[in-house]
Amino acid sequence: TTELIEGIIKATKFIKSDYDQIDQEIFSSQFIKKAKNSQFLIIGSDINTKLFYNYNLINQYLENLKNNVKEVLLRTNKINNINIIFFNVSLLISSYYTSKNNFDKIQKKIKKFNEFLINLSIKNKNLIILDVDKLKNFIGSKNFYDISNYYLSKTPYSEITNNYISFEVTKIINAELNIRKKCLIVDLDNTLWGGVLG
């Protein structure tokens, strides 16, 4: 995904994590140094391929994510001009692996966590939530995940999903950096021009 973003934003340098766990990166001795040298910190995590719909595991996982985002905000609060892009959690795909009652409880828990993220982003202007759940609804559940990617590279998403996530991250970065694009409007019969000026 970073290769796609780097291709779109030419003047951007990306530092990849030394670890494959969010906790390890946040609590590493190099975290603050990396954060001070960065304008953006991108934290993505997904629940659908890891926890097999166990309510207690999902609850524990979401609590851990809550603590992670709070810790990141705490550790970066004295750093100027850093934006944290944090992925929300997509709702579960189906209830095949659990009871209907348990499935509904899990969905409510995930919705509550996503609301927590939105409220936290309102209080912390440097926290930007990337709505992965909305992307899943747009792309479709069947096209969103690719389990073989998870086993190959711990990336649960399909190629098309990676492209969409890259595009969304790029839009956020461009907006925050105020990157302007030139736009040529060809409107030979003046049907669009009034709306463009408005």
Where are these regions (language model features)?
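Extracellular glycan-modifying ectodomains
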Residues: 1-186, 191-198
